């Protein structure tokens, strides 16, 4: 709701530079939206209003979508680090909110990450799960082994991106004065554990 007061509103008033990066699942990211990240208190944003996979189309501050080539979590962190480095150069405290698109169906992964999960149990190949197709956007049934392999590959890429963020915070001497808060909004579908 546009009338909500966010942490970004409060920290901006306290002198923080506030940025949002990744999945903005609160409303549209276009400039005219009353709930885009800027309207909700962020000075800068590089965001998409839904999940994203490879080559994500991000809007920079409400502009037309621009495709950032590569794996979505890596592109999200690259933009986040640019923002943090700029805040460091300005000697300004910052709030960098990162909402990854991963892990999220229909799932996809980089070949190097998929290869890590080539040896999942064969019995998973006999079971199927229903999820959205990357090709058609429609619901389809796929082997659980294939789906888990892609899901785990997305988690691996996201983990690598978080590691890149942590490493860069240390290199910038910001680690000791920065709070990292991680939570997720995409639990496993119930059929995975059965």
Question: What would you call each of these model-derived segments?
Answer:
Residues 1-8, 26-28:
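His/Cys-centered metal/cofactor-coordination and adjacent catalytic loops
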Residues 13-14:
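Conserved dinucleotide-binding and phosphotransfer motif residues
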Residues 20:
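Extracellular polysaccharide-degrading/modifying enzymes targeting complex plant/algal/animal polysaccharides
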């Amino acid at each position: 709701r546009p009338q909500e007061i966010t942490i970004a509103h409060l920290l901006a008033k306290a002198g923080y530079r506030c940025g949002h990066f990744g999945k903005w699942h609160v409303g549209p990211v276009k400039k005219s939206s009353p709930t885009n990240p800027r309207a909700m208190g962020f000075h800068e944003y590089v965001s998409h209003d839904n999940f994203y996979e490879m080559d994500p189309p991000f809007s920079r501050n409400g502009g037309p979508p621009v495709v950032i080539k590569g794996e979505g979590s890596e592109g999200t962190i690259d933009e986040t680090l640019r923002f943090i480095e700029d805040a460091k150069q300005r000697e300004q405290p910052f709030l960098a909110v990162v909402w990854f698109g991963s892990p999220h169906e229909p799932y996809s992964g980089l070949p190097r990450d998929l290869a890590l999960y080539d040896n999942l149990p064969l019995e998973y190949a006999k079971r199927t799960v229903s999820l959205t197709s990357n090709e058609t956007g429609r619901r389809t049934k796929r082997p659980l082994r294939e789906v888990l392999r892609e899901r785990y590959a997305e988690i691996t890429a996201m983990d690598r991106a978080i590691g890149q963020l942590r490493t860069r915070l240390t290199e910038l001497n910001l680690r000791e004065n920065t709070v990292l808060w991680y939570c997720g909004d995409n639990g496993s579908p119930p059929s995975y554990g059965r």
